[in-house]
Amino acid sequence: MSARQPAIADTALVTAIDAVIEAGRRSAERGWVPATSGNFSVRVDAERIAVTRSGVDKGRLTPNDVLCQQLSQPLVAGSSAEAELHRRLYADDAEIGAVFHTHAVSATVLAQLHRGERLLTLSGWELQKALAGIRSHETVVEVPVVANDQDVVALANEVAARLAAPVAAGAVRAPGYLIAGHGLYAWGHTAVDAFRHLEALDVLFTQILTLRRHAS
């Protein structure tokens, strides 16, 4: 059942659906979600999220392409398997209000390059101050990298373990993680925050790849 079919008008749900559609459109404009890839979700309330269904063009989303998912329940029919990664993030952190996943080239390639280290470190970039809690370009920002896994429950458990682990002394964890050869998950307290993090991380990753090309 689509999220636009509640028996009673649900303003919070409608607002979340609209935010999901907007995030999908803006990401498609930037070329981050080719060939129906990626998925987007926004928290409705403590118990529910609005999340994109499987196999739809994220640049042309309609309300019927967005599902209402109870955090405590199995994935609803039509869900992407990756909706479990969204559900787990919300369930583990009540401060997360939106989660956006893209297949941008910069994120996918860097994640593959750092698969062995299982970590990408950012430092020295002014734009990293666009990430919540970062006040200086000198701050060391850690972005976890996990191996891709078609067992999404196992992948969600791996991500949860990585996010629960301590960062290095003096470092700060980014509001996102990378899946090797797959892409980026970024989140924020609101949909606006999550998209800012998504955009900032994409540019930061592009800057790193550009620097490496010139340094080689």
Swiss-Prot record:
Q: Which residues bind Zn(2+)?
A: H101, H103
**Annotated GO MF terms:** aldehyde-lyase activity; methylthioribulose 1-phosphate dehydratase activity; zinc ion binding
User: Is ATP-binding given among the entry's keywords?
Assistant: no
How and how many cofactors are bound, per the record note?
A: Binds 1 zinc ion per subunit.
Which GO biological process entries does UniProt record here? L-methionine salvage from methylthioadenosine; pentose catabolic process
E.C. designation(s): 4.2.1.109
One GO location term (cellular component): cytosol
Please verify whether the record's keywords include Zinc.
Answer: yes
Tell me what reaction this enzyme catalyses. Answer: 5-(methylsulfanyl)-D-ribulose 1-phosphate = 5-methylsulfanyl-2,3-dioxopentyl phosphate + H2O
Names of required cofactors: Zn(2+)
Which Cys-Cys disulphide bridges does the record give?
A: none
Record keywords, A-Z? Amino-acid biosynthesis, Lyase, Metal-binding, Methionine biosynthesis, Zinc
Q: In which pathway does it act?
A: Amino-acid biosynthesis; L-methionine biosynthesis via salvage pathway; L-methionine from S-methyl-5-thio-alpha-D-ribose 1-phosphate: step 2/6
Role description = Catalyzes the dehydration of methylthioribulose-1-phosphate (MTRu-1-P) into 2,3-diketo-5-methylthiopentyl-1-phosphate (DK-MTP-1-P).
Family, according to the entry, reads as follows:
Belongs to the aldolase class II family. MtnB subfamily.
* Protein's recorded name: Methylthioribulose-1-phosphate dehydratase
Organism of provenance: Bradyrhizobium sp. (strain BTAi1 / ATCC BAA-1182)
The gene from which this protein is expressed is mtnB
